[in-house]
């Protein structure tokens, strides 16, 4: 049984969510203290060891004995309270011992870290665990990958990267090739992204730079400490947890305003309007003019000039959306640079000090003059017109002139920093660029194939990204291609989307690819409407859990083994995950039996008392339950005793919704089977 209480919004209460959820500035390169605290480092020959926590040790070897104290792309802040540790030495080398680890270094003539010269033993636990330098981690719990483009299920273009946690009890991050942030000789007041810290290559001298995480199965502490040295996971703006509309289509401004009106007429919430590539001059229009993209990329995929045929008055268009509480995002493919037909082209040529007869400004994002103009000439004028944030789509290249720097990573950093410098709550919507990108929140997972296999893969994939601190994957709900989607599959995808970090529908430019939920027949349309409204109701809960993510470094959408690491079943239920501290969700990812209209699903009930939402039955775990679910049901467990903040579903942010407290009391008579 659940109890709901509607709270009348008063002036005092309306202040409560911001007070609870305001996130202090994250640790950024310009704010970090990359030098370790005095007493944390031990140097031995060509090696230096930095004891960051009792379970996290940095290990450096340098042929010329010059060690790196600047922030890298991944590790920014090494000045932590120094844990107690001891150092002993003899003719063979040294031993460092913390409360949890014992490090032994017996260098050979070169001193490099090898399986014979460096080892670390984890204390405690039923059996000792010893790591040797260079050892492969065969039990790593994985992290994430750059993109799901073209994937159907687990068939990926690029493999999953290792995570920071492992059933082995340890993981190692090799930071040897990571670029560094420069250090200004004197304090700098940052007004633009090029002021102060800037990216530089590492030394070319032979070196090793490793970070050993020896946390056993305390995965939560591993991620908390990782975020202490690598920067926090920023809290997205509240609107990001609502309903996003996105579709690749040649919309006009009137088409989109009509679409918003249809949301209102159907009493459906809408918080974010994403406008895909046709907001700017598109491929068909440019081909008719006989133009060619001199970057070599696809014509019309990038642009900074409004498509006046579709958007004759973009400022007025975005003002109308803002008046209804709807935020606006525009799509970009920045790697194309700036072509000669762009309205901003003359100003870019001037800003780059290029000749007047220049035909094309290439994408030179690692050069300060380009980065400065990229924002001041190309983006800020559009933001003044009303653009709230940018969808930075696929970056065709993976390298830059700076060794080890991926342009995706660097763009994420620059866009986030630019918003901070403008005093905004930053929001970046882009691809995963690699370790350290957890600081630039929302990931676009790419163009998946609309299959049951794709849907079935996403719950595991999304939760697993917690292992590198990447808390906010956004998927194309319904998949991207090829076109029409089975109504049942779309319904189940939307139901999963409700219980994912970001709720965003999308599809390719195909008239048969329908994402308007009122266009579907019953019973699908009614179930889809219920799901959209449920997502809006969950915003206070999600925002609260996102604040916890900021505070702890532990993603609210995470694998079961974070909270129950010694329960084997927590590792064997790939479709089941934690969704905030009070919920465990296991979305249906297969079709119902056409004869019964039901599908069988098994849930693992974690230790403690839990209420199965659809039946209202209370179970005490650990145990497994198997039952049948209809199309309108999503398997879900609510922690008994949970008090969950919710709100009524309204469109946008212009209307103040009623706040609701939902209480799930404990049961005196526990259902165990």
Where do the model's predicted regions map?
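Boundary at the C-terminal end of the N-terminal hydrophobic targeting segment
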Residues: 21-23, 30
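Catalytic core of carbohydrate-active enzymes
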Residues: 416, 436-443, 457-461, 465-475, ...
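Bacterial N-terminal signal peptides
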Residues: 9-18
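A low-complexity, Ser/Thr/Gly/Pro-enriched, surface-exposed linker/loop concept
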Residues: 27, 52-91
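Aromatic-lined carbohydrate-binding/catalytic grooves of carbohydrate-active enzymes
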Residues: 234-399, 438
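Aromatic-lined carbohydrate-recognition surfaces of secreted/lumenal glycan-active proteins
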Residues: 241-247, 274-275, 326-339, 392-395, ...
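Alpha-amylase-like alpha-glycosidases and glucanotransferases acting on alpha-linked glucans and related
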Residues: 353-394, 423-451, 505-527
């Amino acid at each position: 049984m659940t109890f709901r209480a509607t709270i009348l919004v008063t002036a005092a209460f309306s202040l409560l969510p911001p007070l609870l959820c305001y996130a202090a500035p994250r640790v950024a390169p310009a704010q970090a203290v990359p030098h370790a605290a005095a007493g944390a480092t031990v140097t031995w020959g060509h090696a230096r060891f930095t004891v960051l926590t009792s379970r996290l040790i940095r290990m450096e070897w340098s042929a010329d004995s010059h060690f790196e104290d600047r922030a890298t792309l991944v590790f920014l802040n090494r000045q932590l309270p120094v844990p107690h540790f001891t150092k002993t030495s003899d003719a063979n080398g040294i031993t460092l011992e913390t409360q949890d680890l014992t490090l032994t270094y017996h260098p050979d003539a070169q001193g490099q870290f090898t399986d014979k010269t460096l080892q670390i033993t984890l204390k405690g636990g039923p059996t000792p665990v010893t790591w040797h330098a260079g050892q492969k981690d065969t039990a790593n719990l994985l992290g994430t990958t750059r993109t799901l483009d073209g994937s159907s299920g687990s068939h990926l273009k690029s493999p999953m990267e290792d995570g920071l946690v492992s059933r082995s009890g340890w993981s190692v991050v090799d930071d040897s090739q990571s670029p560094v942030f420069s250090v200004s000789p004197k304090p700098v007041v940052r007004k633009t992204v090029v002021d102060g810290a800037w990216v530089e290559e590492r030394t070319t001298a032979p070196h090793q730079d490793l970070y050993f995480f020896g946390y056993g199965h305390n995965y939560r502490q591993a991620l908390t400490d990782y975020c202490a040295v690598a920067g926090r996971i920023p809290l997205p703006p509240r609107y990001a947890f609502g309903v996003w509309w996105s579709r690749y289509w040649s919309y006009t401004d009137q088409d989109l305003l009509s679409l918003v009106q249809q949301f209102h007429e159907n009493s459906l919430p809408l918080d974010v309007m994403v406008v895909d590539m046709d907001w700017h001059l598109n491929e068909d229009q440019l081909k008719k003019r006989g133009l060619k993209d001199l970057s070599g990329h696809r014509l019309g995929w990038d642009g900074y000039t409004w498509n006046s045929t579709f958007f004759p008055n973009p400022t007025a268009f975005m003002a109308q959306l803002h008046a209804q509480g709807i935020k606006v995002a525009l799509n970009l493919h920045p790697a194309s640079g700036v072509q000669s037909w762009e309205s901003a082209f003359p100003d870019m040529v001037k800003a780059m000090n290029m000749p007047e007869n220049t035909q094309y400004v290439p994408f030179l994002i690692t050069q300060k003059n380009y980065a400065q103009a990229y924002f001041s000439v190309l983006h800020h004028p559009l933001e003044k017109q009303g653009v709230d944030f940018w969808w930075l789509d696929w970056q065709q290249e993976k390298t830059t002139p700076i060794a080890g720097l991926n342009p995706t990573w660097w763009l994420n950093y620059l866009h986030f920093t630019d918003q901070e410098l403008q005093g905004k709550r930053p929001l970046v919507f882009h691809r995963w660029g690699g370790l350290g990108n957890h600081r630039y929140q929302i990931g676009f997972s790419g163009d998946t194939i609309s299959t049951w296999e794709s849907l079935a893969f996403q719950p595991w994939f999304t939760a697993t990204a917690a292992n590198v601190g990447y808390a906010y994957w956004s998927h194309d709900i319904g998949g991207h291609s090829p076109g029409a989607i089975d109504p049942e599959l779309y319904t189940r995808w939307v139901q999963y989307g409700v219980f994912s970090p970001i709720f965003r529908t999308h599809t390719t430019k195909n008239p048969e690819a329908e994402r308007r939920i009122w266009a579907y027949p019953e019973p699908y349309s009614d179930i889809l409407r219920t799901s959209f409204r449920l997502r809006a109701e969950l915003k206070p809960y999600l925002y609260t859990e996102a604040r916890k993510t900021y505070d702890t470094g532990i993603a609210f959408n995470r694998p079961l083994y974070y909270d129950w690491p010694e329960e084997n079943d927590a590792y064997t239920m790939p479709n089941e995950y934690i969704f905030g501290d009070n919920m465990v969700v296991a979305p249906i990812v297969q079709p119902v039996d056409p004869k019964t209209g039901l599908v069988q699903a098994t849930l693992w009930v974690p230790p403690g008392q839990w209420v199965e939402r659809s039946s209202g039955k209370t179970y005490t775990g650990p145990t497994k339950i198997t039952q049948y679910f209809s199309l309108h049901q999503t398997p879900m467990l609510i922690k008994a005793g949970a008090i969950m903040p919710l709100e009524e579903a309204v469109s946008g942010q212009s209307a103040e919704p009623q706040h609701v407290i939902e209480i799930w009391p404990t049961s005196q008579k526990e259902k165990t089977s």
